[in-house]
UniProtKB/Swiss-Prot annotation:
Belongs to the ThiG family. One of its GO terms (cellular component) is cytoplasm. Catalyzes the rearrangement of 1-deoxy-D-xylulose 5-phosphate (DXP) to produce the thiazole phosphate moiety of thiamine. Sulfur is provided by the thiocarboxylate moiety of the carrier protein ThiS. In vitro, sulfur can be provided by H(2)S. CDD domains: ThiG. Its main location: cytoplasm. This is Thiazole synthase. GO terms for molecular function: thiazole synthase activity. GO terms for biological process: thiamine diphosphate biosynthetic process. The lineage of its organism: Bacteria, Pseudomonadati, Pseudomonadota, Gammaproteobacteria, Enterobacterales. Keywords: Cytoplasm, Schiff base, Thiamine biosynthesis, Transferase.
Length: 271
């Protein structure tokens, strides 16, 4: 079981709603995925009616909807979008996305942290999409985010876990769930993330653009289940498996440590 804020999930596969060829195919694929948390871009929703081609099928699934702020380029725009989503969809959950760079869609760390602080204070359950930066993820955790969502590789690239080393550090030090988001292009990537110790993955493009989105969604479902079972069963030597010896070096070692130098300076000051 995975708990985020006040909600428990039995599925560790979260999914998106973009790029499907039809709402009907989207609904069928999401059913096959077994996902219980589905994200949707507010810019694609008809806020006037609150009931459109995206919302109608999603509500049939009985899942938790996670509106995202995709398209926002600043903290102010993201906060505005989150407030709109809360009113239109009656949810205080939000996936925080701020990416001003339209070419690579990389998240803006400064604006993301600023928006997260405001939204958490307003009572939102904030799940921020961010770079695989261990320092930033810790800061997002400290301001009250319910989970962190570091990228595996750029959105829609299907390149897999190109940030693996940094994801390891994030997972090791995080006290909130870690959801690997973006770049997961094959079921094997999702399995790898779960074996690594991630709490969940979010997949959209790889399912939506597959020759058979329904079969691919089911494949991802099985991969995530397998990855979680493998981790719980106890992989070989790994820093995430306390029953086995830790043979991996994950800590940095300074080539020019300042310890002795600073001690000498302190001694000189006291002379």
């Amino acid at each position: 079981m995975l708990k985020i804020a006040d909600t428990t999930f039995t599925s560790r596969l979260f999914t998106g709603t973009g790029k499907f060829s039809s709402p009907e195919l989207m609904l069928e694929a999401l059913r096959a995925s077994g996902s219980q948390l589905i994200t949707m871009a507010m810019k694609r929703v008809d806020l006037q009616s609150g009931n459109d081609a995206i919302l109608a099928p999603l509500r049939q699934l009985g899942v938790r909807l996670l509106p995202n702020t995709s398209g926002a380029k600043t903290a102010e725009e993201a906060i505005f979008a989150a407030r709109l989503a809360r009113e239109a969809l009656n949810t205080h959950w939000v996936k925080l996305e701020i990416h001003p760079d339209v070419r690579y869609l990389l998240p803006d760390p400064i604006e993301t942290l600023k928006a997260a602080e405001v939204l958490v204070k307003e009572g939102f359950v904030v799940l921020p999409y961010c770079g695989a930066d261990p320092v930033l993820c810790k800061r997002l955790e400290e301001v009250g985010c319910a989970a962190v969502m570091p990228l595996g590789s750029p959105i829609g690239s299907n390149l897999g876990l190109r940030t693996r080393d940094f994801l390891q550090i994030i997972i090791e030090q995080s006290k909130v769930p870690v959801v690997v988001d973006a770049g997961i292009g094959a079921p094997s990537h999702a399995l790898e993330a779960l074996e690594l110790g991630a709490d969940a993955v979010l997949v959209n493009t790889a399912i939506a653009v597959a020759h058979s989105p329904v079969q691919m969604a089911h494949a991802f479902r099985l991969a995530v289940e397998s990855g979680e079972r493998a981790r719980l069963a106890g992989l070989g030597a790994s820093p995430f498996n306390p029953s086995q010896p830790d043979t991996l070096q994950l800590r940095a070692t300074a080539t020019s440590p300042l310890t002795g130098f600073l001690s000498q300076l302190e001694e000189q000051e006291h002379v």
